[in-house]
């Protein structure tokens, strides 16, 4: 049993190149197709099979020195009214937008940072 645990640890810690080499060996010497090896690798090491994040949340961490500029930027970017935008900025850290694409999230972050805000993408 200890040998299996040691083998599993070695398998999980393989680099991408080593996994490719292993897939080639399994295919050439044992007739196991790479798709089957990938299924085995996913079962053994879940971290390696993690999906890329597709939806992001834009989080306003703090307004910074130019709070008025940040309120204006939040108002323009979200379509909120002036009071709602001010309340969102005052409540920092707060979510400006949730479930947006990477491109949209990066655009929002850039605009808010240009206004002086500290922004994080989650």
Swiss-Prot record:
Alphabetized GO MF terms: mRNA binding; structural constituent of ribosome
GO terms, biological process: translation
InterPro entries attached to this UniProt entry: Ribosomal_bL12, Ribosomal_bL12_C, Ribosomal_bL12_C/ClpS-like, Ribosomal_bL12_oligo, Ribosomal_bL12_oligo_N_sf
Keywords noted in UniProt: Ribonucleoprotein, Ribosomal protein
GO cellular component: cytosolic large ribosomal subunit
Domain of life: Bacteria
Keyword check for Acyltransferase: no
Disulfide bonds listed in the record: none
Pfam families noted in UniProt: Ribosomal_L12, Ribosomal_L12_N
Keyword Ribonucleoprotein: yes
Function (record text): Forms part of the ribosomal stalk which helps the ribosome interact with GTP-bound translation factors. Is thus essential for accurate translation.
Family the UniProt entry places it in: Belongs to the bacterial ribosomal protein bL12 family.
Subunit text: Homodimer. Part of the ribosomal stalk of the 50S ribosomal subunit. Forms a multimeric L10(L12)X complex, where L10 forms an elongated spine to which 2 to 4 L12 dimers bind in a sequential fashion. Binds GTP-bound translation factors.
Name of the protein described by the UniProt record: Large ribosomal subunit protein bL12
Annotated organism of origin: Flavobacterium psychrophilum (strain ATCC 49511 / DSM 21280 / CIP 103535 / JIP02/86)
């Amino acid at each position: 049993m200890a040998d299996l645990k040691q083998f599993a640890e070695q398998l999980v810690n393989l680099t991408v190149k080593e996994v490719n080499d292993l897939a080639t060996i399994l295919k050439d010497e044992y007739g196991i197709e790479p798709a089957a090896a990938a299924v085995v690798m996913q079962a053994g090491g879940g971290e390696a099979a993690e999906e890329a994040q597709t939806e992001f949340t834009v989080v306003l961490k703090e307004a910074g020195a130019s709070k008025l500029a940040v309120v204006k930027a939040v108002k323009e970017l979200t379509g909120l009214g002036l009071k709602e935008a001010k309340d969102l900025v005052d409540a920092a850290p707060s979510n400006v937008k949730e479930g947006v694409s990477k491109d949209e999230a990066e655009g929002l972050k850039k605009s808010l940072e240009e206004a002086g805000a500290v922004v994080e993408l989650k």
